[in-house]
Each structure stands twice: as C-alpha cells, then as structure tokens.
C-alpha cells in the first residue's frame, strides 16, 4: 500500500491560559461534567502557565520524523492534527485534500487498543474525512505499537536513567512501578474484552525484563468520575501509601501508558505523587517518556513501512501477530475477536 503523506494524530492541549477552559469543554463535551470540576482540573494546566506540553512535544516529534525521512532518503509530507484543540484533525485533513494528498498513513500518539486509545482515533479520522468532503484522502491508521522493540528499548533505558538519579544507597531496594491511565472497568470489558489492560500488562512485562527487573508493580492513575463507578485499580496513590506502610524507601515510576509528557505525567506524577511520596518518606524517580526521541520517530516510520509491505512487523518475541487481532498491522481494528484473546495473556 502506497502513501503520499503521514498524519500525526494526537489528543491536543491548550497553549495559553485563555485556552484552558475551552479545551476542557471540548474534552468533556456531552459527559455532563460540572463546570466547577472543570475549573479544578484547569488549575493543573494553569500551574504551568496554561500550556500543556503535548503540542510542543508533537511538533518536535514531527521535526524528528522529517529528519529521519531525510536520513532515509525519503520524501513524505507530515501533517499534524488533534482531537481536542488546534490544529484540529478536520483542518489537517482539509489541508491534505487541498495539497492533493490521495492516501495518508495515520500515526496516533497512543500505543494501545481499546476505546479512548484506538476507537476514538478512528472516529477522529472519520470526522476529519467528513469535514474534507468528497475529495478527502483515504486515511489508514497504523497499528498498535505497545510491543515494538524501540518502545520497549526507550522505556527500559529511561528506567535505568531514573534509577541512577536516586541516592546510591536506595537504588537496589527501589520498587519499580509501571503506571497507565485508568479507565472504567466496564469500558475495558467492552473492548477486547480487556484489550487495553492486557496490552498494558504485556508491555509492562516486556519493559521490566529489558530493564533487568524481575519484581515490579503495575498500577493505574488519573481516574475521574463518580466514586461509585469502578475503574481499573490499584490506584497509584493508594499503592504508594501501601508501600510506605511496608517500609519501602524509594520508588521508580515508569509512566508506560504515556508516550509523551501529558499533563497527567507532569502534574499527576511529578507534582501530586511526588509530594505524596515525600510526605511518606519515600524517594521518587520518574522515568521519562519517549516524547520526541529520534527512536520514536523511527518507530513511526517502521509502522509505515510495515503497512506498505516493505518489512515484516517488528515485535518483541512473544506476541502472535495474527491478522484480525487488535494488534494487527492495520490499526483500524481496536478490539480482539474471541479467538485472539488468549494470545497476549500468556
């Protein structure tokens, strides 16, 4: 399959104080979230001047993708679109149409299956094509990449760097925690079932092994919504408190669920969890996310090559890449058929 463009598709984020509330209203539209709750979340962004890191990181990533294309001797225009803020996906697809693009690969800045991590990006693609009208380019989403060797390598390396930042006498006893964004249990059950949580669990095992850890914990973070609705657990804050009770003196936190420093990383982890850990007498080191690492750019182009048929899928050994599963080469599939469920649980 040939492509004449690449679309980097992401979540979006505000880039100034006056954009914070409109952005949050976009994110929560139709969910009935009280405005006072939005105002509370807005304070997290305002702590950083109303600027989310994500757009700047994505622009830097696009720069790395373009540089990598040049290093490979390839020419492929790269476009940028978001779900919730400027530049919107509708504008990006319309620009591609106006530039004469006929078929584009779509690289979503999410490594996972499930609804918000995959299906919603397919909905974004459909919305973008609808906005561009009858002459809209064909858009093909690239696969989930939770098991790509470069993603595993980047996270494993970042764990080692984080460990070295701890006091020398605490490094060997530090507990390694992998964290990802929690979602409602019912939502996880509907997609796969449990494709998202299974992929996170599998990637956690891959990265831990690559980093040289046989013992670690997988936790969840950033839940929202009414307490009566069950979300994936354990919550990272509850788990850190439990570790303190057991006498743990240091933790290394790897935000494996995030490919970039979203506000959930720089606020929820670097501010809230770090403050909690300090209050409990626990030293904390946070592993970096891929952000705009050149290897992340290479990963994106590897996926394009896979879909073009130029190379076999790159996966860490242990995952069956059978077509039709949520982790097939064509990333439009966001949940498994029943025959696929057992393939990433062993």
From Swiss-Prot:
Source organism superkingdom: Bacteria
GO terms of biological process kind: heme biosynthetic process
Location relative to the cell: Cytoplasm
The protein's Enzyme Commission number: 4.99.1.9
A GO CC term assigned to this protein in UniProt: cytoplasm
Keyword Cytoplasm among record annotations: yes
Keywords for the protein's UniProt record, in alphabetical order: Cytoplasm, Heme biosynthesis, Iron, Lyase, Metal-binding, Porphyrin biosynthesis
Reaction catalyzed: Fe-coproporphyrin III + 2 H(+) = coproporphyrin III + Fe(2+)
InterPro entries referenced in this protein's UniProt entry, alphabetically: Ferrochelatase, Ferrochelatase_AS, Ferrochelatase_C, Ferrochelatase_N
PROSITE patterns assigned to the protein according to its UniProt record, in alphabetical order: FERROCHELATASE
Gene3D superfamilies reported in the protein's UniProt record: 3.40.50.1400
Presence of keyword Iron: yes
GO terms assigned for molecular function: ferrochelatase activity; metal ion binding
Pathway: Porphyrin-containing compound metabolism; protoheme biosynthesis
Family label: Belongs to the ferrochelatase family.
Function per UniProt: Involved in coproporphyrin-dependent heme b biosynthesis. Catalyzes the insertion of ferrous iron into coproporphyrin III to form Fe-coproporphyrin III.
UniProt-recorded name of the protein: Coproporphyrin III ferrochelatase
Species of provenance: Mycobacterium sp. (strain JLS)
Organism lineage: Bacteria, Bacillati, Actinomycetota, Actinomycetes, Mycobacteriales
Gene transcribed to yield this protein: cpfC
């Amino acid at each position: 399959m040939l492509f004449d463009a690449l679309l980097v598709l992401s979540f979006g984020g505000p880039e100034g104080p006056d954009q914070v509330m409109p952005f949050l209203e976009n994110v929560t539209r139709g969910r009935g979230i009280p405005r006072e709750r939005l105002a509370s979340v807005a304070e997290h962004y305002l702590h950083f001047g109303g600027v989310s890191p994500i757009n700047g990181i994505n622009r830097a990533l696009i720069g790395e993708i373009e540089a990598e294309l040049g290093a490979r001797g390839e020419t492929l225009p790269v476009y940028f679109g978001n779900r919730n803020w400027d530049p919107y996906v509708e504008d990006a697809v319309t620009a591609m149409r106006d530039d004469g693009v006929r078929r584009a690969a779509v690289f979503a800045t999410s490594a996972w299956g499930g609804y918000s991590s995959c299906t919603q990006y397919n909905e974004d693609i459909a919305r973008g094509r609808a906005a561009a009208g009858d002459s809209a380019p064909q858009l093909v989403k690239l696969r989930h990449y939770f098991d790509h060797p470069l993603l595993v390598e980047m996270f494993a390396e970042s764990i080692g760097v984080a460990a070295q930042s701890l006091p020398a006498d605490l490094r060997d006893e530090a507990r390694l925690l992998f964290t990802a964004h929690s979602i409602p249990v019912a939502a996880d059950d509907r997609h796969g079932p449990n494709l998202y949580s299974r992929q996170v669990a599998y990637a956690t095992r891959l990265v831990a092994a690559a980093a040289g850890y046989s013992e670690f914990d997988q936790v969840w973070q950033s839940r929202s919504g009414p307490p009566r609705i069950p979300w994936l657990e354990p919550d990272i804050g509850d788990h850190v408190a439990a570790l303190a009770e057991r006498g743990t003196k240091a933790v290394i936190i790897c935000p494996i669920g995030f490919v970039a420093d979203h506000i959930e990383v720089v606020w929820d982890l670097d501010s809230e969890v770090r403050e909690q850990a300090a209050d409990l007498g626990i030293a904390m080191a946070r592993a970096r996310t891929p952000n705009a690492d050149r290897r992340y750019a290479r990963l994106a182009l590897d996926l394009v090559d896979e879909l073009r048929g130029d190379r076999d899928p790159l996966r860490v050994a242990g995952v069956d890449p059978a077509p039709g599963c949520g982790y097939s080469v064509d990333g439009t599939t966001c949940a498994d058929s029943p025959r696929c469920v057992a393939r990433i649980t062993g």
